[in-house]
Amino acid sequence: MTRVTRDFRDSLQRDGVPAVSADVKFASSRFPNYRIGANDQIFDVKDDPKVMSMKEVVARETAQLMDQQKRLSVRDLAHKFEKGLAAAAKLSEEAKLKEATSLEKHVLLKKLRDALESLRGRVAGRNKDDVEEAIAMVEALAVQLTQREGELFIEKAEVKKLASFLKQASEDAKKLVDEERAFARAEIESARAAVQRVEEALREHEQMSRASGKQDMEDLMKEVQEARRIKMLHQPSRVMDMEYELRALRNQLAEKSKHFLQLQKKLAMCRKSEENISLVYEIDGTEALGSCLRVRPCSNDAPDLSKCTIQWYRSSSDGSKKELISGATKSVYAPEPFDVGRVLHADIIYDGHSLSLSTVGKIDPAAGLGSYVEALVRKHDVDFNVVVTQMSGEDHTSESIHLFHVGKMRIKLCKGKTVIAKEYYSSAMQLCGVRGGGNAAAQALYWQAKKGVSFVIAFESERERNAAIMLARRFACDCNVTLAGPEDRTETGQSP
């Protein structure tokens, strides 16, 4: 039997942790944290500014895990589940080994305690105390071992639970992979079928396009051949013949209209001669828009027109309202769009006598002018080539070409890239035909852009002059502005 000596206690005291004095003061209430770096170097956590708090570390790792989970496919998840299942099985094996080792430790502790118990009965004195202290330590180790076994049992249960969970997850992942694979195959098949249908539709469309193209080409060739045949049969073409006939009819109509006006004037003269009224002057000219009306003497005894005072008026067809035309004081007056459908009068004062002349009928509109203006309205902005004859009352000798721009919101007069005048439609703006007489009165208009700035502008033809007036008044009316001449009454300012 082995003899226990007093050195057993001394060895226990040497192996024990020496006591800490009560007078010791620690700098912190917890054990300091350290970090082991490369080459087993120890770093203090407080001295490292790059070390993050536990909350930040958890947040960063959580974000990384979320990103990684988003990137992982179903196959990768299944692979990781299988790895986790293998790890769980390995942990289960390690738990079994730990359990066997724990049983061996219990047997050893029991044998050691029995040996110490038998030894306690054989020794006395100080050795007995040492044996009892050793028995207490063995019992404490047994308690710690029991606690450790409990913890191992709990860990074993958790490992089993985790293993079953991972196994179920692995099966679910495999099932999900199979379902996704089947779904992907079905999608691929449907996509192939759709592509095949599209290809077939494209082939049919190409075939139909080729067939229709050939048919269209044949029809076009037939039309070209028919057109060539008609062209060969009609020399000159019927269109040119119709144009010549239409032009001749217009000339005949104009001559008959002029002859009709002459007959009406002769009839009026006959009536006045029967009433013992001798006509000294008369209004000569075509009573239509685009012409010039002139006051001319009817006899050689008539006073010279330069010594007479003349004033032109416009009135309704029944003569109830008579409106003075401001500035129309010459023997020549060119009707403007305001005069269409009205009767024009000329009051003449000579040698203390007063004479009033009037047109035989109402002023007729110009043929085709309305449709021409409607076509210009659809363009929104129209430019006319003009020549400026007067600027603010002074004669302008230059005959250079200017551009008269009539827009939806404003009127502009330009010479090349230089803007001479540009004004929006307003109540201060005036626009009408020229009222000062002259041989080209039917082709000229008067435009007052604003107070103190006015122009007399000559157009290339009577049609363009009247179209510009009607177009500007149309756009101004859309802006709630009435464009008229000087001292014209606004209630009559309606374009025909």
From Swiss-Prot:
Changing V131D: Loss of dimerization and loss of actin-binding activity. Disruption phenotype: Defect in stomatal movment and hypersensitivity to drought stress. It comes from the Eukaryota. GO terms for cellular component: cytoplasm; cytoskeleton. It is found in: Cytoplasm, Cytoskeleton. Residues 126-269 form a coiled coil. One of its GO terms (biological process) is regulation of stomatal movement. GO terms for molecular function: actin binding. Its main location: cytoplasm. Expressed in roots, stems, leaves, flowers, siliques and guard cells. Changing L77A: No effect on actin-binding activity. Gene3D superfamilies: 2.30.29.140, 2.60.40.2700, ATP synthase delta/epsilon subunit, C-terminal domain (1.20.5.440). InterPro entries: SCAB, SCAB-ABD, SCAB-Ig, SCAB-PH, SCAB_CC. It holds the Pfam family SCAB_CC. CDD domains: Ig-PH_SCAB1, SCAB1_middle. Changing A88S: No effect on actin-binding activity. The keyword Coiled coil applies. Keywords: Actin-binding, Coiled coil, Cytoplasm, Cytoskeleton. The NT5 region (73-100) is required for actin-binding activity. Belongs to the SCAB family. Dimer. Dimerization is required for actin-binding activity. Plant-specific actin binding protein that bundles and stabilizes microfilaments (MFs). Has no nucleation or capping activity. Regulates MF reorganization during stomatal closure. The binding to F-actin is insensitive to Ca(2+) and pH. Binds weakly to inositol phosphates. This is Stomatal closure-related actin-binding protein 1. It comes from Arabidopsis thaliana (Mouse-ear cress). The gene is SCAB1.
